[in-house]
Amino acid sequence: MNYNIRGENIEVTPALKDHVERKIGKLERYFDHSVDADVNVNLKFYNDKESKVEVTIPMTDLALRSEVHNEDMYNAIDLATNKLERQIRKHKTKVNRKFREQGSPKYLLANGLGSDTDIAVQDDIEEEESLDIVRQKRFNLKPMDSEEAILQMNMLGHNFFVFTNAETNLTNVVYRRNDGKYGLIEPTE
């Protein structure tokens, strides 16, 4: 894995860098072979009482992301790594369940699940949470700009809002971030 460690309001010391690489490097044991992925780690230090660690590992068939707030930076790194490990194990369980259901490795390879991000089989499989859809809504997407979409989202009291961007005529999503600001998701066409 290639590590990109960035600090905001904190100097990334060699000890901090070693801790990140050592902890996140342990995740490689879940993969059959060496993972060629860029690990993006943002370390943010707000004050004496709060630090934040964001870890993103984009891979071909899986994107891992973890965000943790904690008083201690090292503890936050440990907790973020634990979250990533749970995500990997959950994905591994899903792949293994599909493998058992289909009954043959040929099916997995034919359907693209035998790619370079296969998760190594281990005995300690966690049960996957239920992914039942409990409500479904249908509505027409009104063309609008992102500011109007944010106003609509706030008026409805939602954390996100799907709309058709009037400028690009593509479906976009605005969402409220944890820091109170807003984000926009756009397709790449």
Swiss-Prot record:
Belongs to the HPF/YfiA ribosome-associated protein family. Long HPF subfamily. Keywords: Cytoplasm, Stress response, Translation regulation. GO terms for molecular function: ribosomal small subunit binding. The gene is yvyD. It is found in: Cytoplasm. This is Ribosome hibernation promotion factor. Induction: Expressed under the dual control of sigma-B and sigma-H factors. The sigma-B-dependent promoter drives expression of yvyD under stress conditions and after glucose starvation, whereas a sigma-H-dependent promoter is responsible for yvyD transcription following amino acid depletion. Also claimed to be under sole control of sigma-H. It comes from the Bacteria. NCBIfam families: yfiA. Required for dimerization of active 70S ribosomes into 100S ribosomes in stationary phase; 100S ribosomes are translationally inactive and sometimes present during exponential growth. May not be the only factor implicated. Might negatively regulate the activity of the sigma-54 factor (SigL). One of its GO terms (biological process) is negative regulation of translational elongation. It comes from Bacillus subtilis (strain 168). HAMAP family: HPF (MF_00839). CDD domains: RaiA. SUPFAM superfamilies: Ribosome binding protein Y (YfiA homologue). Disruption phenotype: The expression of a sigL-dependent gene (levD) is up-regulated two-fold in cells lacking yvyD, but the relative amount of the sigL transcript is not increased. In cells overexpressing ppGpp synthase YwaC, deletion of this gene causes loss of 100S ribosome formation by dimerizing 70S ribosomes.
